[in-house]
């Protein structure tokens, strides 16, 4: 089975909201198909400054989604969603809502995206499981109600198919009072 390999860089290898990402420094490799290739990439990635570990995952396919959150002093936690991967930075098509969110609010966030046709499925491509996507948004917003020390969170990408939505990478910034 093809593999995905990523570095374990403190802070997720990304300065918040896309100034640089671990993929920008060669910290992500897709479709590793042999032990030799894996060993070469491991050695190379461990030379990346601040790299402390390597994560090896099965190579999954699906539509890349994004869910994030940011604590705003005046409002509390703002939950964000949209297409993930590079699309969140390039398209800047993000929907937001204040935690805690209901399922109705989560669906409204999803449906308000300009890229909703991609999520729904278009031009012969199957859509993603909106129920699972909405459920993750609601559960994240509920978590934030109780985990007030979370100041920023980024789950990107989530890989979504018509059956499932799986988190591939995540980053959380915590501040204790």
Residue ranges and their predicted role:
Residues 1-177:
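ATP-dependent carboxylate/acyl-activation modules
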